[in-house]
């Protein structure tokens, strides 16, 4: 098991919080484009292409989160229609070829679907390690819906109680860990997912919850992110909250949780 994957699993298990590693982690030179699903507006597409280096920047797409056979082609068409001229989607049947393509990519993109399915497809390929290194070295990594959820180290799986704020009701798995300071939720307002993100933040109070609504993106550059798009992003911060100890299955309770509601043009910095 690689050190990268081992650290993600420790974070997911609650045994190691981001910011507590033995040696300081360098600030990534790249950017994340984290979209809440529901379509990707032109303003987000254009910004992503700009961050990647312009229309000729090489873009690779991993569509394995989706069960639809044409997801890769649809994503390629989306980026071409936005002005990109060098874009292709990658199968994982040849892991070495996929790793090589990522090595030369300026932008890596994940369409929607099921985030657990994508992470399962990556197992044993070595591709996540290359993506992580490319992000640290300056590449742009983006995704929408399920492709946004995988940015976290502690990744929402979709298995949750949306009707209550209950200890242990929101299930997680290990994500790519590209944005380990936060837990990303997607379709956040449109699908009324606030309860599951609050539940998870109270269980992992050292990590900030970022709920991104549809047709909206967080553009992450180092510790800072900014909002572009059409709707809102909710930031739920329990790092200084007074959390009541409760057993699994009980109603979660806390005081002094900080809530930020951000829209296009706004941003903030998250530091541990």
Segments from the language model and where they lie:
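Bacterial N-terminal signal peptides
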Residues: 6-18
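Portal/gating segments that form or line small-molecule/metal binding sites
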Residues: 66-107, 112, 117
């Amino acid at each position: 098991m690689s050190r990268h994957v081992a650290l993600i699993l420790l974070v997911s298990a609650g045994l190691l919080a981001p910011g507590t590693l033995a040696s300081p982690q360098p600030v990534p030179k790249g950017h994340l484009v984290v979209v809440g699903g529901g379509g990707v507006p032109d303003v987000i597409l254009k910004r992503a292409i700009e961050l990647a280096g312009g229309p000729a920047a090489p873009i690779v797409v991993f569509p394995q989160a989706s069960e639809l056979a044409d997801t890769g082609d649809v994503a390629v068409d989306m980026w071409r229609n936005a002005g990109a001229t060098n874009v292709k989607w990658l199968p994982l049947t040849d892991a070495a070829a996929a790793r090589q393509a990522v090595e030369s990519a300026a932008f890596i993109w994940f369409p929607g679907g099921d985030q657990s399915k994508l992470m399962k497809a990556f197992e044993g390929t070595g591709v996540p390690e290359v993506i992580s290194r490319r992000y640290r070295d300056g590449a742009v990594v983006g995704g929408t819906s399920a492709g946004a959820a995988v940015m976290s180290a502690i990744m929402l799986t979709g298995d949750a109680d949306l009707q209550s704020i209950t200890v242990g009701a929101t299930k997680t798995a290990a994500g790519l860990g590209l944005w380990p300071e936060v837990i990303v939720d997607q379709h956040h307002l449109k699908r009324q997912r606030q309860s599951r993100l609050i539940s998870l933040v109270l269980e992992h109070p050292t990590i900030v919850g970022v709920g991104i609504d549809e047709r909206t993106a967080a553009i992450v550059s180092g510790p800072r992110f900014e909002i572009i798009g059409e709707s809102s992003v909710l930031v739920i911060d329990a790092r200084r909250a007074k959390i009541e100890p409760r057993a699994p299955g009980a109603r979660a309770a806390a005081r002094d949780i900080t809530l930020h509601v951000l829209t296009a043009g706004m941003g903030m910095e998250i530091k541990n």
